[in-house]
């Protein structure tokens, strides 16, 4: 079960982190080994064991342990259950009182493989060697958190307006500039929401300076202070993530005197990751929000009321890479097994696309609006770090075994490279 805790003070940034950030680099570098039913039942602690096609991605030497032909196919289901609950704000008020659970189930194929074994007929030295091809899942991206509740203290679109004001004061634009598409080129992707929000009416110019903004869910009282409605706003946050990371492995193994087992992998990685997230705010009582629009030509004023607003962010990332891996298993004493493997860094060739949209609804539909923008595909390289696997196991004849594994990877070695083309 995946448990997600969300604080709505920061939720407007939902999904807005670029796929070229450290969090994404870590996500795409980590391995959540899957494999066959046998290896998963052992928690994939197979570095020192081998003998199963699900273990080849962990230690290539494992293919030489099983002195027979093998074919495996492992279907599965991937379950995701997300639970969300709000936290108490500094003033003692809880905006999201109830727990919300949301689940998602997907079919998966953790392992598919074949291995051929060739006996040399010798009693010592190279007694047999193997050749195999294995497909192993190393990550499943599957989550769908959902959070909702009533908030009288903070507004996501108020925060969007505050961000627009900060950018305007830093000289990136004035309100008039936000109608020019070139403004997107000046901003980071996570700030595109400011442009779509302004064009849709989710935020608006406040005053005449062109550098002050107000959110659709806010109003200015008689003293000039910006406030939320007395009855607050209903907020909803949702996110759906899907995708996978799969290794396609060509393997060769060798058994030396039933004591030393060697193996080597040439691996290709295929990655797909898609995320769609949104935050929506609705007025509990639209009469709390008197929104005044002023006609720039006539000076006439029109009063309408805020109904709802929604901001969405989507990202789609794909990648392909290659790596090499070498492994060894040694059986120095009957029952004792020691294994180790080392994998080269993986150079991933990545492509990412992002989309942002904003919607604003007023009770006078003439003032409602929608705006969306999608980025061109960006191409770059991601180098994931080298990793090493160590394992030790003890077998009790045909009665059972104990196995322990340790994987070492220096994630500070994650690097991005710009595409020269």
Predicted features, each with a name:
Residues 20-34, 39, 117-421:
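Outer-membrane beta-barrel porins/channels
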Residues 11-12, 68, 407, 414:
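Hydrophobic alpha-helical membrane-insertion segments
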Residues 1-23:
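Bacterial Sec-dependent N-terminal signal peptides
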């Amino acid at each position: 079960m995946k448990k997600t805790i969300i604080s709505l003070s920061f939720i407007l940034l939902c999904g807005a982190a670029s796929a070229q950030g450290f969090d994404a680099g870590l996500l795409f570098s980590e391995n959540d080994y899957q494999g066959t039913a046998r290896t998963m039942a052992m928690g994939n602690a197979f570095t020192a064991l081998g003998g199963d096609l699900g273990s080849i991605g962990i230690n290539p030497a494992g293919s030489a342990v099983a002195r027979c032909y093998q074919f495996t196919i492992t279907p599965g289901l991937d379950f995701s259950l997300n639970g969300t609950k709000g936290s108490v704000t500094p003033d003692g008020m809880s905006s999201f009182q109830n727990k919300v659970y949301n689940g998602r189930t997907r079919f998966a194929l953790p392992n598919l493989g074949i291995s051929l074994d060739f006996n040399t007929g010798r009693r010592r030295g190279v007694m047999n060697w193997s050749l195999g091809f294995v497909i192993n899942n190393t990550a499943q991206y599957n989550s769908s958190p959902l959070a909702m509740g009533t908030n009288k203290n903070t507004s996501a679109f108020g925060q969007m307006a505050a961000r627009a004001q900060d950018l305007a004061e830093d000289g990136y634009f004035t309100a008039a500039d936000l109608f020019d598409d070139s403004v997107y080129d000046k901003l980071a992707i996570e700030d595109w929401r400011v442009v779509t929000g302004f064009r849709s009416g989710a935020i608006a110019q406040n005053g005449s300076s062109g550098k002050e903004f107000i959110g659709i869910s806010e109003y200015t009282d008689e003293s000039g202070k910006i406030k939320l409605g007395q009855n607050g706003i209903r907020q909803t946050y949702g996110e759906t993530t899907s995708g996978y990371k799969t290794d396609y492995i060509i393997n060769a193994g060798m058994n030396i005197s039933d004591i030393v087992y060697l193996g080597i992998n040439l691996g290709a990685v295929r990655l797909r990751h898609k995320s769609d997230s949104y935050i929506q705010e609705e007025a509990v009582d639209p009469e709390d929000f008197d929104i005044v629009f002023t006609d720039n030509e006539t000076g006439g004023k029109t009063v309408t009321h805020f109904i709802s607003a929604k901001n969405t962010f989507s990202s789609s990332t794909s990648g392909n890479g290659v790596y090499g891996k070498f492994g060894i298993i040694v059986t120095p004493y009957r029952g004792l097994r020691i294994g180790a493997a080392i994998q080269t860094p993986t150079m991933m060739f990545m492509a990412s696309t992002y989309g942002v949209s904003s919607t604003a609804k007023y009770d006078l539909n003439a003032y409602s609006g929608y705006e969306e923008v999608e980025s061109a595909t960006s191409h770059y390289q991601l180098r994931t770090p080298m990793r090493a696997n160590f394992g030790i196991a003890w077998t009790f004849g045909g009665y059972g075994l104990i196995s322990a594994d340790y994987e070492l990877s220096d994630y500070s070695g994650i690097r991005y490279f710009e595409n020269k083309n």
